[in-house]
């Protein structure tokens, strides 16, 4: 027994620090892994475009992935449309350079946001539910496209938040989406829509 205790005390301090460092790194790696989107979401290959989309675990995971694929296709079509039509406009250059169709996913179950753009388009995430915690009822494609254009408007906007510049870009993209037959704007003042537990009551397309 005395021999074993002696070995412990003569152990090089650098060895102990090395073990502590390794343990610390393992804990950090585990935290990062379990906090990633891929761990909290289920990634499904869409039958629409063959790409993989990460969505919440639900009975309709395939429908959810296909819904994101359809929205991604429409967003790409809109971005390409305005890029060809307005190649010199600064807001369009920001949109074209910022939008990343490879990083479209559903919001995490723990997310406080209904939808968001990370780093001005590096990643777009959407709640796909009509009611916030009801994974059984997906939002309709038309309403989700309105939300997607809202997020694309953030990508096109230099300022942060919902300032005048944002609302001008939002209305502009809605007008272009209408002209390109990508999205037919709906007057939510006349007919509000429920989306992820909130009510959409306004559409800047109809603002004078």
Where do the protein language model's features map onto the residues?
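Metalloprotease/metallohydrolase-associated module, dominated by Zn2+-dependent proteases
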Residues: 23-49, 58-139, 159-208
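Active-site recognition of the HExxH zinc-binding catalytic motif
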Residues: 146-158
């Amino acid at each position: 027994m005395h021999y074993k205790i002696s070995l412990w005390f003569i152990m090089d301090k650098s060895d102990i620090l090395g073990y502590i460092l390794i343990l610390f790194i393992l804990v950090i790696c585990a935290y990062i892994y379990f906090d990633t989107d891929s761990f909290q979401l289920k990634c499904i290959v869409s039958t629409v475009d063959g790409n993989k989309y990460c969505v919440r675990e639900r009975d309709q995971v395939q429908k959810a992935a296909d819904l994101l694929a359809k929205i991604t296709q429409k967003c790409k079509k809109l971005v390409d449309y305005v890029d060809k039509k307005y190649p010199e406009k600064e807001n369009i250059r920001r949109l074209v350079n910022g939008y990343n169709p490879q990083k479209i996913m559903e919001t995490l179950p723990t997310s406080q946001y209904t939808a968001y753009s990370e780093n001005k388009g590096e990643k777009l995430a959407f709640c796909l539910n009509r009611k916030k915690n009801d994974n059984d009822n997906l939002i309709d494609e038309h309403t989700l496209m309105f939300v997607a254009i809202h997020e694309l408007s953030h990508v096109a906007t230099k300022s942060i938040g919902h300032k005048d510049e944002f609302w001008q870009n939002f209305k502009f993209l809605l007008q272009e989406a209408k002209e390109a037959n990508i999205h037919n704007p709906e007057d939510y003042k006349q007919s509000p829509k429920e989306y992820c537990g909130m009510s959409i009551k306004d559409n800047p397309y109809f603002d004078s």
